[in-house]
Each structure stands twice: as C-alpha cells, then as structure tokens.
C-alpha cells in the first residue's frame, strides 16, 4: 500500500482494509478500519449515503429519504465491512473510544471528527495521514459544528455582552487558533487567510484535508423534530449492524416513523 495514495473508492477502501487487517490465529490484532456507530451514527451514515448519491432529507426538513434504494445500499455496505469483508468488528463500535483504538493501533483506519486531529497529532507514536472519505457514486461528507445563540428573553445588557463575546470568538484569528488547537475547521475562509493558520497548514498539510473536503459536503441530517428523527435513524442503523433487522427492514421502519412525525409539517 502507498500511504500517499489513500483509498479513493469504496472498493479500494475494502481492498486496503483487507491488507491492513492483522490476525493471530482467530483473533484480530489490528482491524483494517473502524467507523463509529454509537454517539452519532446518523452523522457517519450521512457520509455513506451521500457517497452513494443520496441525501437523508429534503431541503425543507419535512421529509426523510431513509428507505430510498441508495440509502439502503449504503447501510448494506456499512454492515458488509464487518459481516462480509471482515475488515471491521461486527456490531457497534464506540464513538468515545475509537480515537484511543487508533492511537493504540487497534485499527489502521478510523472515520472520525476532524476535531480529533490535534490530539492524534500530539499523541500518535507513529506516522499517520489524513484522507478524504472514499467515493462510490461521488465523494460525500456531512458538515458538523455548533451554534452561538442570544436569547431574546434576556436583558439588553446581557445581549450586548453576548454579542461582544460572539464577535470575539468568531474573529478569523480566534477561529484559526481554535482550528490549530483542536483540529476543527476554521469557521470561515478568512481564518485560512491568517498567517498563523497558513503557516500551520504548510507545516502540517493534514490540517487542510477537512477544509478541502467541504467541496463534497452535504448538510447533516436536520429536520423538524430533529432530535427524534435522528434517534429513529440511529436506532435503525444499530439494529442493522447488530443483525436484529436487515438494512431494508430497519430503514423502512425508521422511514415510517419519520413520516408519521413529519407529515404535519408538509
């Protein structure tokens, strides 16, 4: 394998995973890859679905696409990485311990938030790289992140103070610093025009991979009643990965539940 030529397609990802899986008898010393399926399964799945040419919801946020053929194919592929190809543990994989599994070389590849990058950089005792996620019909990744809010039922003084803090935290110099110290993206292109972040990216090119991957990004799953809808999809993904339902059955059930919840918003 050429570490400077990471897998660019699903087929290449599987092939690389097989070469990277190391066994001692019946036990696995190092898995080829791990994709977390607790914490934010819907988020990881948004990448796989988009790579297969399918979004998880419409632009109005009142209809989901969980039972579309391309969505089902994406979940079948995810499950097959463990059940058929043997490059990933079967069942669920913990979000919270995956980074440590990578640092301990229990998996050769991990799919995870770019917010782990600086911690991995500081703690990895081996050379590592960062690559864009592989494509099937196209490349795809979900966006992530959080928000600042100012509540209307607060005093004018509190609102002014909140706005002052938000303006400070969102200055290009601050978001660039935040990116370097965490691995998260700078929250605007201006951050990447600061000398500090430009110098950092020049010295550590992996810091620019997630930024460059935005070209292929889709919005993360967001609908009316988002929390409930995400839970429906999370449960469906996990039930398929552990084998209690087929991907088609699990996603069909999730779609029916989401339809009942979202029809009032159409």
Where are these regions (language model features)?
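Beta->alpha turn/N-cap motifs
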Residues: 95, 112-117, 134, 146
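Bilobed periplasmic-binding protein-like "clamshell/Venus-flytrap" ligand-binding domains
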Residues: 21-37, 171-182, 261-266
């Amino acid at each position: 394998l050429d570490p400077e030529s990471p897998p660019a397609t699903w087929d290449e990802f599987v092939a690389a995973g097989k070469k990277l899986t190391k066994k001692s008898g019946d036990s696995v010393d190092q898995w080829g890859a791990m994709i977390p399926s607790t914490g934010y399964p819907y988020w990881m799945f948004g990448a796989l679905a988009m790579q297969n040419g399918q979004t998880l919801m419409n632009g109005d946020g009142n209809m989901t696409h969980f039972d579309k053929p391309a969505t089902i194919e994406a979940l079948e592929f995810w499950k097959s990485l463990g059940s058929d190809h043997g490059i990933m543990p079967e069942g669920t994989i913990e979000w919270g311990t995956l980074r440590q599994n990578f640092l301990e070389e229990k998996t050769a590849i991990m799919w995870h938030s770019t917010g782990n990058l600086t911690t991995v950089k500081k703690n990895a005792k081996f050379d590592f790289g960062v690559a864009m996620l592989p494509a099937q019909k196209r490349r795809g990744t979900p966006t992530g992140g959080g928000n600042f809010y100012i509540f209307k039922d607060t005093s004018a003084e509190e609102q002014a103070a909140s706005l002052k803090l938000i303006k400070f935290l969102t200055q290009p110099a601050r978001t660039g610093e935040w990116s370097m110290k965490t691995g998260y993206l700078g929250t605007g292109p201006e951050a990447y025009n600061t000398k500090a972040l430009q110098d950092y990216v020049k010295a550590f090119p992996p810091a620019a991979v997630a930024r460059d991957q935005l070209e292929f990004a889709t919005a993360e799953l967001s609908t009316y009643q988002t929390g409930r809808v995400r839970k429906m999809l999370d449960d469906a993904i996990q039930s398929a990965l552990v084998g209690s339902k087929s991907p088609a059955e699990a996603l069909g059930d999730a779609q029916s539940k989401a339809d009942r919840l979202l029809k009032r918003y159409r």
